[in-house]
UniProtKB/Swiss-Prot annotation:
Keywords: Coiled coil, Repeat. The molecule is in a coiled coil structure that is formed by 2 polypeptide chains. The sequence exhibits a prominent seven-residues periodicity. Homodimer. Signal peptide: none annotated. It comes from the Eukaryota. Residues 103-133 are annotated as: Disordered. This is Tropomyosin. Residues 1-284 form a coiled coil. Belongs to the tropomyosin family. Tropomyosin, in association with the troponin complex, plays a central role in the calcium dependent regulation of muscle contraction.
Amino acid sequence: MDAIKKKMQAMKVDRENAQDLAEQMEQKLKDTETAKAKLEEDFNDLQKKLTTTENNFDVANEQLQEANTKLENSDKQITQLESDVGALQRRLQLLEEDFERSEEKLATTTEKLEEASKAADESERNRKVLEGRSNTAEERIDVLEKQLETAKNVATDADQKFDEAARKLAITEVDLERAETRLEAADAKVHELEEELTVVGANIKTLQVQNDQASQREDSYEETIRDLSKNLKDAETRATEAERQLTKLQKEVDRLEDELLAEKERYKAISDELDQTFAEIAGY
């Protein structure tokens, strides 16, 4: 009888221990399931971050391609502007050469005009001298008449020369006006070209600034891509580690569930044995 009581007490202790162990196992299982849920949540967050990182990488890559396209367009514009500047400089040189030729022609025309004016003045002085002599010497009328006729002829020639000089002067004045007009047009064109060169220079400086900014943005994009690539690699590493931890926890959960099932079976066996013992005691 004492042996039965001891056995019952031992079985009772085993049952209590088994019950405590089962409760501990259930609590451990709950904790494990909580950790598993937390890991699954972290894993989902990592997947979301990974997706966001991939999207940011794609956006940065597109921005980098756009920056490269803009940089190529800027280089083409700079090349075209440099070509335009060269053409404008050649045109300016041609205009300067035309202006120099106009000045030379104007100087030549002015010199010829001065010579014609001197010849006309000389003829006029000769005519006046002849007229004075005809008034003071009547005995020399015949001679003077001849001289006068000669003087008239000279005067006529002088008038013709004067008319020719006047005509040439008029032509020269027209040429001078045309030269002045061309000079003014050349000055205006030079001023216009200088303004165009100023604008082109400003545009070139602007394009150079844009080119520098594009280079800076390109460096920034490359750095961003490197950072995103590193973040992507880190996220992939964390995701792999999370999957490994999740697999490990799943195995631990399976093991604990197996142990819990074994403890429940053991507890059931102890309970059945106690029930059988109580039945045997009741039979006595």
